[in-house]
Amino acid sequence: MNKNQKPVLTGQRFKTRKRDEKEKFEPTVFRDTIVQGLNEAGSDLEAIAKFLDSAGSRLDYRRYADTLFDILVAGSMLAPGGTRIDDNDKTKMTRHCVFFAEEDHDAIRNYAQVFNKLIRRYKYLEKAFEDEIKKLLLFLKAFSETEQTKLAMLSGILLANGTLPATILTSLFTDNIVKEGIAASFAVKLFKAWMAEKDANSVTSALRKANLDKRLLELFPANRQNVDHFAKYFTEAGLKELSDFLRVQQSLGTRKELQKELQERLSQECPIKEMVLYVKEEMKRNELPEPAVIGLLWTCVMNAVEWNKKEELVAEQALKHLKQYAPLLAVFSTQGQSELILLQKVQEYCYDNIHFMKAFQKIVVLFYKADVLSEEAILKWYKEAHVAKGKSVFLDQMKKFVEWLQNAEEEFRI
């Protein structure tokens, strides 16, 4: 059965909505238009920004965003891998781009403003620009050292002002640029530019937010992925703040693993001697200081028990439990700082767990008798090193014992 032929409208014109009136260009035609506009604007970045602003109303930035950003950064379209498609035809290139700018922070910052204005004007370019920078970082091997430096500075400045997210840095963990040493060198330049705009806290906060704080070692080949090498490399480059940051982050990761293992051993009621040996080995292997370990031990010991909900019974239960593990704590409280940290941890714990409020003084006295805490540490805590939590309550509890320590004349009775 034949289908009826559908009627055809003749002589009818459909008007395109103004917002859809975009010139239909192939990438090469789009390129030629952008290159011509940049060349006409010359080195006047304000004129370049105005050209890009007005051109967006007639050129299809959404479709050709990668071409647009290739030209603004490298001066021409880039082939996969980063080579310039138009390298032999100077009419298809422009020198008014990031790679031909002066290798100077202020000069690159001025170019960064061009990108900021463009992306503020055409918000849909934000994701495309992020993808472009990720791509360019993968192409680093194809760029000269000075081009790499300028791209690093641009990226650092745009990271600092929030135009780019820190997640772009994942491209630096690619094997081919890591093995060549390009990733680490680029990262140093990028972080320096970032910190010139903001500060170290801005960098470390963004890295944590992007879950990159524990991946920084991946900037180096596998045989050099250790804290010492990272610290030496970044410190010599003038970025000691990042070296210190990585040490802290690695230490935190190590402490979590140590705490997990200790919790397991405590639940299995392992002999204290075995736990002492294990902790000492971990301290040596991971360069953990004693003050960091004592607080962790206190947490593990207190987490190992299901505490009685009745205030009048919990103190007795706590003293019995802590008396058992006092020898373990004593091994790792040989320094004044360690003792003060332990005292502060006990204070915070008793404040945060209301049933322990009245047990604080008894715990401190127990630790004093078991050689976990010294007279000097207790007196220092009492005079100046206590924390704010429950201060008045705990200082009042400790008053008589402190007087006894100070006078050492009359016997203290619990």
UniProtKB/Swiss-Prot annotation:
Span of domain W2: 248-414
Region (Disordered): 1-22
Entry's localization field: Cytoplasm
Cellular component GO terms held in the UniProt record: cytoplasm
Domain of life: Eukaryota
Function: Translation initiation regulator which may repress non-AUG initiated translation and repeat-associated non-AUG (RAN) initiated translation by acting as a competitive inhibitor of eukaryotic translation initiation factor 5 (EIF5) function.
Assigned protein family: Belongs to the BZW family.
Protein name: eIF5-mimic protein 1
Protein's organism: Gallus gallus (Chicken)
